[in-house]
A protein has these predicted regions:
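Active-site Asp-x-Gly
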Residues: 174-176, 187-235, 242
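ATP-binding pocket architecture of kinase catalytic cores
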Residues: 25-135
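Short, surface-exposed alpha-helical segments at coil->helix boundaries
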Residues: 5-9, 63, 224-228
Length: 295
């Protein structure tokens, strides 16, 4: 989006009378939208603007999810304004507060990093659920999971068979989940988590599906041993574990087909793991999950 687009003036005027945009730059990532760090010459000052792409109708869903996430005890962007009618840029846009910090996808103090992620997940999963409806109650992963398309190698076939066999026995206990909780969406400042961003996929789902999703990202970055330490740290905090984690770990088999996108996102954040090694890490995580299920 060009800085000269008249939509920026309309946005600024919506946020504060006679306000002007004095500075802006596009942020790394953004997922299904283009995200910008924008500075105004008056309050609210520095904000993040997310402009959704043509044909993307998820802006109202994300706005609802972000507003619900305000009850989370960890720092979350504050919703400021929404243009769901596409009057600013010809596309839907939402404005939120900017949090301090940046992602850490190559931690030096791994033990502290893992412990902080586990505590953040636990804190998130303790969020009160009263009033959750609409976008937050869409079908959980256990109801929407499908095996990856195309021909499967032997490891993928075993994983798919194991998931298919265990799906009917998965519990229906739901907590509030971020939906995309991974290191690239966790901000750090001075060695501590300073916020969690991108609540576009937030919904009610099981804690084990979210933990498995995060483990998958950690495994891709740092290997299965570190991913296992995250599971241990989380289970130590909540006081129990479940074989369902292994089932959800196996559901992540499809992530191998999107590893190139994950690799590019990590590269933009300043970390460039060995792509083939990262794929081998994901395969090893699948083998460990199959072993835990005696499959």
């Amino acid at each position: 989006m060009s800085p000269r687009h008249p939509g920026w003036d309309a946005l600024a005027e919506t946020l504060a009378r006679d306000a002007r945009v004095t500075r802006m730059h596009r942020l790394v990532g953004g997922g299904s939208a283009d995200a910008y760090d924008v500075t105004l010459d008056r309050a609210p000052g520095r904000v993040v603007v997310k402009v959704f792409r043509d044909g993307d109708d998820t802006a109202p869903l994300e706005w609802t999810r972000l507003k619900f996430a305000q009850r989370v005890t960890m720092p979350v962007p504050e919703p400021i304004a929404a243009d769901l009618e596409s009057t600013w840029f010809g596309r839907p846009a939402i404005v939120m507060s900017r949090l301090t910090g940046r992602p850490d996808v190559a931690p030096k103090a791994v033990d502290s990093w893992i412990g902080s992620l586990a505590r953040a997940l636990t804190e998130l999963h303790e969020t009160a659920l009263d009033g959750a409806e609409g976008a937050l109650t869409r079908p959980p992963l256990a109801e929407t999971w499908r095996p990856p398309a195309g021909q499967h190698d032997s490891l993928t076939s075993r994983a798919v068979d194991a998931v298919t066999a265990h799906l009917p026995s998965l519990t229906s206990e739901h907590v509030f989940t971020h939906g995309d909780f991974n290191p690239s969406n966790v901000l750090w400042h001075r060695g501590r988590i300073s916020g969690v961003v991108d609540w576009s996929a937030a919904r009610l789902d099981t804690r084990w599906s979210e933990l498995a999703y995060c483990r998958d990202a950690v495994c891709f970055l740092l290997g299965p041993e570190i991913a296992d330490r995250l599971a241990d740290a989380y289970s130590d905090i909540v006081g129990y574990t479940s074989d369902e984690l292994a089932v959800y770990d196996l559901m992540s088999v499809s992530s191998r087909h999107y590893a190139a996108a994950s690799f590019e996102a990590d590269r933009q954040l300043g970390h460039t793991p060995d792509y083939e090694v990262s794929l081998a890490h994901l395969d090893e995580q699948l083998r460990r999950a199959l072993k835990r299920l005696d499959w």
